[in-house]
Amino acid sequence: MEFNLKGKYGEAKVFADIIDDRTTGQIIGILNTPLGENSHVRIMPDCHAGKGCVVGTTMHVSNKVCPNIVGVDIGCGMLVVELGKIDLDLKIFDEIVHKIPSGHESYEEPSHDEYSGKRVSTSELQWYGSGLIHCNENHPGNWFKKLKCFNELDQVPRLIGNLGSLGGGNHFIEVDVDDDGNKYLVIHSGSRNLGKQVAEHYQKIAKKQYVSKRRNEVIRMAKAEGKEKDLQEILKTFKLPVWDETLFYLEDEDMQNYLHDLKLCQEFALWNRRMMALTIIERYFIETIGAHEDVVGRYKDDKIVFVSKTINVGKTAKSVWTYNFFETIHNYINFDDMILRKGSVSAKEGERLIIPMNMRDGSLICIGKGNEDWNISAPHGAGRILSRGEAKNTVSLEEYKEAMKGIYTTTVSQSTIDESPMAYKPMDSIVENIKDTVSIEKIIKPIYNFKASTEEPIWLKEKE
């Protein structure tokens, strides 16, 4: 199903069956600002109301941009590592995953001392090759200084410690399996607190920029009407107009500074996910097949190559492992075609992508069709049908546990109930609405799931 919505400055096409009044209002809100002018706004099937704008928005960016539309979790997305027909000890795997900082944790915290050394050696891999980090020659803080807004950042050491950490909310680490028995490591995370600080900083600038322009406009009009003597009184009573201040936008130099920092945040988010994948897989080899601490993974094109110079005698003779991987980003601006995607993903012709449904039903692995009418985009998930508050108030823990039967997880609890399968739209409603933009290659089902919980993690309990 698709329909159009119109506003003062533009029109949007909505590809959705299920949409509520608040979501509709937020779409029209964008169209009632200059942001909607000639922006080719397309709304994805998983759309729902978000903080300040609709999750599921795609639009073209030219001479203005609103940081709130991209959002605070800049560069958030999914990393998929194809593990093949590997046998996994999920108990050991879970213990390793619990040592990845999640929620508000970071590697700067003393409780992660036993992993911090491993983290540093791991981060040397290709961080310097990407220009992001070289642990020996350049302190990580030097990379952060590339940000135009560096001097406005708070707690930079903690931001550095967030590299390779999961975060909370709907972020997860999962192992899925397809019908042929192939397993997939799936990691969903973003730019952590860095993206939040950058987004909020530039949204404040957008407001200041808008207020300044409006004030200058009032002054100009007063002078043109011969009311200069009344100018001070006029300025006291002038009001900010018309639309929600969450949609104030940047132009000119401020916009270019934002785009510069946005690109860096997107890079940070990408390597944050890659860091976690390397740490998990390296540690799993060390714990299960006798690989010594020298095992190191490196990213090369669309592959991860792990090498160990020494293997414990009698365990295995293999010392090189190669896995394919791909990534799907959903809160970002694509600088190749200047398409902004907020809760939506790229679906270029032939492009492989993942669309997660929920922690019970797994994900769709799809191939993009390059549909221009869809802004070459697809939904980033099933989309919420219950807000976090509604889920906590209406879904019982027993119902949640029942839904997750058969999936290895130690994080099903009251604190993650807002991410339960019942909080999301049914898979069928998404599958039926994406045929024009992607073809479904396969459905992968979870056998393991981890979400950040406010409860004390297992690895910390063991230290007591």
Predicted segments, located by residue:
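Domain-length cofactor-binding catalytic modules of enzymes
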Residues: 2-29, 36-43, 49-57, 64-67, ...
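Long, low-complexity, Ser/Thr/Gly/Pro-rich intrinsically disordered segments that act as flexible linkers
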Residues: 102-109, 113
